[in-house]
């Protein structure tokens, strides 16, 4: 199964594609969609077009996207929601089912700790996908979203289900935490 993860943002939207076979995770591609400094409609159109192109080029079977959180600044929350909507439209237009996970669920599923830092996310995604270099934070979050979806988004079942892949990388789960 091929999964596309999306980390939505108005200026930068991260994407990550992985293949999943049993408990094996394989990196396909990742990157970011950067929007021009332009009016809102142009930026949203860029996100929609970018996501649509990724869906066409990489033919994922499913997609996962981060849920919007309510920010201190309501304007920022509204703009993020619109960027997320443009990305979801691109996914749905490509015929994909879309799952949604909170940032807390994402971090718990990938790192084992819901308050994990961006650096911890990047390190764990790099290990789980056996990458030669560390992806940028937006791409890492998107890859993490795909990993989270691949294992149902549940912390304990995700970490337990990843045990074979983690063991190959010299890691294991202990009391719901990842140890090296």
Curated annotation (Swiss-Prot):
Amino-acid positions noted as binding Mg(2+) 1 in the UniProt annotation, renumbered to this chain: 7, 138
* Annotated binding of Mg(2+) 2, by residue: 66
Identify one Gene Ontology CC term for this UniProt entry.
Answer: cytoplasm
Cofactor binding, note field: Binds 2 Mg(2+) ion per subunit.
**Reactions the enzyme catalyzes:** Endonucleolytic cleavage at a junction such as a reciprocal single-stranded crossover between two homologous DNA duplexes (Holliday junction)
Q: List where the protein spans the membrane.
A: none
Q: Which Pfam families match?
A: RuvC
Keyword Nuclease part of the UniProt annotation: yes
Keywords linked to the UniProt accession: Cytoplasm, DNA damage, DNA recombination, DNA repair, DNA-binding, Endonuclease, Hydrolase, Magnesium, Metal-binding, Nuclease
Looking at the record's lineage, which domain of life comes first? Bacteria
Alphabetized CDD domains for the sequence: RuvC
Family statement: Belongs to the RuvC family.
Its subunit composition reads: Homodimer which binds Holliday junction (HJ) DNA. The HJ becomes 2-fold symmetrical on binding to RuvC with unstacked arms; it has a different conformation from HJ DNA in complex with RuvA. In the full resolvosome a probable DNA-RuvA(4)-RuvB(12)-RuvC(2) complex forms which resolves the HJ.
Q: Which NCBIfam families match?
A: ruvC (TIGR00228)
Please report the name of this protein according to its UniProt entry: Crossover junction endodeoxyribonuclease RuvC
Q: Which organism is it from?
A: Burkholderia cenocepacia (strain HI2424)
**Native organism taxonomy:** Bacteria, Pseudomonadati, Pseudomonadota, Betaproteobacteria, Burkholderiales
């Amino acid at each position: 199964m091929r999964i596309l993860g999306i980390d939505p943002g108005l200026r930068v939207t991260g994407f990550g594609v992985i293949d999943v076979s049993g408990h094996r995770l394989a990196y396909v591609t990742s990157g970011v969609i950067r929007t021009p400094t332009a009016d809102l409609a142009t930026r949203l159109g860029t996100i929609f077009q970018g996501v649509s192109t990724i869906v066409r080029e990489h033919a994922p079977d499913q997609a996962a996207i981060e849920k919007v959180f309510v920010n201190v600044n309501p304007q920022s929350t509204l703009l993020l929601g619109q960027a997320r909507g443009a990305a979801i439209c691109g996914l749905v237009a490509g015929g994909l089912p879309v799952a949604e996970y909170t940032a807390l669920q994402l971090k718990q599923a990938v790192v084992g700790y819901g308050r994990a830092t961006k650096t911890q996310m990047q390190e764990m995604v790099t290990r789980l996908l056996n990458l030669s270099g560390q992806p940028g934070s937006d791409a890492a979050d998107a890859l993490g979203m795909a990993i989270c979806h691949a294992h149902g988004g549940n912390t304990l079942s995700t970490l337990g289900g990843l045990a074979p892949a983690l063991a190959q990388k010299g890691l294991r789960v202990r009391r719901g935490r990842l140890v090296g």
